[in-house]
Amino acid sequence: MQNTRNADERGGLVARFNAWLHALNRRRLLRRRQAKHRAAERQWIAADDPSNPPVAHALQERFAALQQPAMLSVVMRESTRATASEWPWFRGPALTPNWHMVSPSGGSIAEAVRASPSEIIALLPADCGLAPHAPMMIAEAVARSPHFALMYADEDCAAGNGGRHSPLLHCGWNAELLRSTPYLAGLVVVRRSALLALEQQAIESDSALWWDLLLRLTERAAEKDIVHIPHVLSHRIGAERVSRQLSAAHADAAEVAVVQAHLDRCAVPARAHAASTGGVRVRYSLPSPAPLASLIVPTRNGLHLLRQCVHSIIERTTYAPYEIIIVDNGSDEPDTLRYLDELQSDARIRIHRDGRPFNFAALNNAAVPLCRGQVLAFVNNDVEVITPDWLEEMVGLAMRPDVGAVGARLWFSNKTLQHAGVILGIGGVAAHIHQRLSRDQPGYQGRAQLTQEFSAVTAACMLMRREVFEQVHGFDEAAFAVDFNDIDLCLRVRAAGYRVVWTPHAELFHHESATRGANRSNEQKARHAAEFQRMRERWSRWLDNDPAYNPNASLKNLDFSFSIATEPRVSLLKPWFEQSP
């Protein structure tokens, strides 16, 4: 019965995905009719196995759609050289391509395109078919971003019956995610000059060779010059590669070596390792001596939770040095007060009394001047340490000069996922993604198990350098006393030019809102509504277009599922990151 139900659910999902594609195709036809510029001189495709029937079929469809002849640079395998001259759509002077060869392993793509007159090259993996509308979308993207360094697009899987399934809707540029997994695995558009500038690499693994190429092409590029085309422009053939992308595949030695070489080229003091849950884990080196971390823990009564939190920090944390600043917000239970007095015998712990009406932002702000540390850790009193090296992991990331805030992986008491990053726009403002997953569930594209950037993380456990906190003027205690203060802070950190990183390798339990509870009174509901509205007014542009998400993905679901509304969120008639009317 369970298998039947799962099959029915998958069938319904595939049907909704194809209905969604049909809605997008209606707009695409309209967009073609309204196109005012010709794409022909901007269309170059490079495929590493053009004899693959799906690839060949897609190329033939593409030629049929052109309004005038185009040049084509094809990067192919040695074994397909002879068959290229037999492709019927290449016959005749107007459609004669330049073709070049590249070995599937250990070869140099730069050498393969050296003789090409084309400045723009689209790289298409051998197990992919090209969407017929891809040249048009590439041309439009180039017109919008003429100084691009690299472009990439969404992808899906083509079934034998002509249907489509398993959409891979990518997020915006995410440097930390690319260090964890080669998430840009479909159609990639690059400049010929950039390919020619690459040094030849002797890498025996196809997947590692591709990952190395992506890292080299992006590691010196400005973020604004790495462009995501939020449309499905390629279709994977075969389930193996799709399965790898839908979850976090285990990295082999060649892939780990590729990431390590990238870190070395970028002078990043870190070591790459194969992560037990999949992908690559990068351990960032700590400065010597390690900086003092100041843990700020607001609390009120709730002795059991506070004792559990403090005990887990003291008994399990392997990092040193650290201090704990407990902010007592008016505790009046005798057992709690006695416990607070006992804690002061530990030289690492200080108690700060602050009896003002509860204002999470103000309590943390007021505690910062009391901290001696270079690193600030905002820690709820209802968390419990799981991984002993949680602070090593988070401090290592927080001390990176381009990182402004770091979040942890948090689990509910029942061992389901509570926090794996915050996605903007869901529910109107934001929501935790991948909630309620079990430990063995990797999440969409494996992202519940991979270090990556988000626009925001929760302050239930968040680290940042003190200088960054002071630069952005801390929490906004006037506008966001209780709700959204951590999201607002992270967005100001992002606006200041820093990255916000979430790591799955620092794990804690979070017995969520166990001390204060949910918003139940009329006064609490009114306060929440006011803070909700302030977030919408201050950050509406960001809330509607989170770069850690995909503009085709649903704003209703917490699992990265694509939009199944009557019309897709992404528009072809206006800039991609504007919603359709």
Predicted features along the sequence, with ranges:
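Short aromatic/hydrophobic "clamp" motif used to bind/position activated sugar donors
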Residues: I121, L376
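A recurrent flexible, glycine/aromatic-enriched loop bordering the glycosyltransferase active site
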Residues: R164-S193, A361-A362, P369, L417, ...
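A short, conserved alpha-helix in the catalytic core of glycosyltransferases
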Residues: A194, E204-H231, V259, W390-M394, ...
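Glycine-rich, basic loop-to-helix element that forms the pyrophosphate-binding segment
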Residues: S105-S116, D354-C371
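Short, acidic, metal-binding catalytic loop of nucleotide-sugar glycosyltransferases
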Residues: A64-P69, E86-N98, R144, H311-P321
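C-terminal, non-catalytic tails of nucleotide-sugar-dependent glycosyltransferases
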Residues: Q2-M71, A249-A290, N414, I426-E453, ...
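Conserved donor NDP-sugar-binding/catalytic core segment of glycosyltransferases
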Residues: G129, H133-H165, E223, V383-V429
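A conserved hydrophobic helix/loop-capping motif in glycosyltransferases and polysaccharide synthases
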Residues: L72-A82, P93, S294-L305, C309, ...
